[in-house]
Design a protein with these regions (language model features):
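Active-site environment of divalent metal-dependent phosphoester hydrolases
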Residues: 10-16, 49-54, 76-86, 130-135, ...
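N-terminal active-site segment of His-dependent metallophosphoesterases
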Residues: 1-71, 77-86, 91
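Active-site-proximal loop/helix segment associated with metal-binding centers of metalloenzymes
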Residues: 124-207
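Binuclear metal-dependent phosphoesterase catalytic core
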Residues: 18, 120, 209, 215-226, ...
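Short amphipathic alpha-helices and their capping/turn segments at secondary-structure boundaries
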Residues: 31-33, 57-63, 103-121, 172-184
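Active-site-proximal beta-strand elements of phosphoester/diester hydrolases
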Residues: 2-13, 121-129, 187-191, 251-257
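Active-site neighborhood of phospho(di)ester-bond hydrolases with catalytic His/Asp-centered motifs
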Residues: 5-7, 42-47, 70-75, 113-116, ...
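A basic- and aromatic-enriched beta-loop-alpha substructure that forms the phosphate/nucleotide-
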Residues: 68-139, 148
């Protein structure tokens, strides 16, 4: 069975902010032609859209293109929506409220499975969370990383998730990753990346790089040899094999669309076709 792996659609940067479904679908069609490839199934590792309406309509659209669509949430998907261009046509005052709405809407769409802390058909998924343990300099610390996240970073300013208690969020996703990986899915999806994907050199000394990654070795070691871990968040396309401490091999995939002024494939010379993968 062929899977196409993709993430970070940010489709509301490519389509107008609209409540007119026919208008949105015209832009979705062009977006699909430029960024997607045929396959039996599609895995989308988060950041479909900031806007809730665009998010749900994109799910409906993509469901018509593949036999199965698997999705996990991204950091942009779960932002609060309080007073946008459309006034208060639907408010989401907490990220939990928005997450629940997306799960309920996805459950209504045939062929779509939103895997937030869930597993289906041998595919597990969750958004994940950075663990604040990456140190970009010798003077960095978890405390300063968390302070920067809370006061300056997009997530800390636009989420209201567990009251933005970074410690609770880290514990939640550590528990989720352990439970999901222990079920040995053939594909693990997350939006945040295991550090085992590696970080391009130009980001290593950037304090904000900490907010993309977590240490994934304990979870990868739970997976079987030949498993796949798909992630997103960074807008650099990556495809590499990782060998864990137990000698098992895992394929790591990150295929972001990114923003209109970016070229995710440039860093490592990859292309869309590299992310169509045959999975037994």
């Amino acid at each position: 069975m062929k899977y196409f792996f993709i993430s970070d659609l940010h489709v509301d940067f490519y389509a107008p902010l609209s409540r007119n479904v026919s208008t949105l679908r015209k832009y979705f069609e062009l977006f699909f032609e430029r960024n997607f490839l045929p396959a039996d199934a599609c895995c989308i590792a988060g950041d479909i859209a900031n806007d809730y309406f665009t998010y749900v309509e994109l799910l409906k659209f993509i469901a018509e293109k593949y036999n199965c669509v698997y999705v996990c949430l991204g950091n942009h998907d779960i932002i609060m929506e309080l007073d946008g261009r459309f006034g208060v046509d639907r408010e989401f005052k907490t990220s939990e409220e928005k997450n629940a709405y997306f799960i309920a809407e996805a459950d209504k769409i045939q062929n779509v499975m939103l895997l937030e802390n869930r597993i289906a058909d041998g595919i597990a998924g969750c958004m994940g969370m950075c663990d604040f343990k990456y140190m970009h300099s010798p003077t960095a610390s978890e405390i300063t990383n968390k302070m920067l996240w809370a006061t300056r970073w997009f997530d800390g300013r636009h989420w209201n998730y567990m009251k933005n208690d970074s410690g609770r969020l880290c514990k939640l996703y550590d528990s989720v990753f352990r439970k999901l990986s222990q079920k040995r899915p053939k594909i693990m999806m997350s939006h945040f990346l295991p550090l085992e994907f590696e970080m391009p050199d130009r980001y290593r000394n950037d304090p904000c790089s900490n907010f993309f990654y977590f240490h994934g070795a304990p979870y990868l070691e739970n997976l079987d040899d030949g498993s796949i871990w798909q992630a997103g968040h960074t807008h650099t396309a990556m495809k590499r094999e990782f060998t864990d401490a137990k000698g098992k091999h895992h394929l790591l995939l990150c295929n972001p669309v990114g923003y209109p002024d970016e070229n995710p494939y440039a860093e490592y010379g990859l292309k869309r076709e590299d992310f169509v993968v045959e999975v037994e």
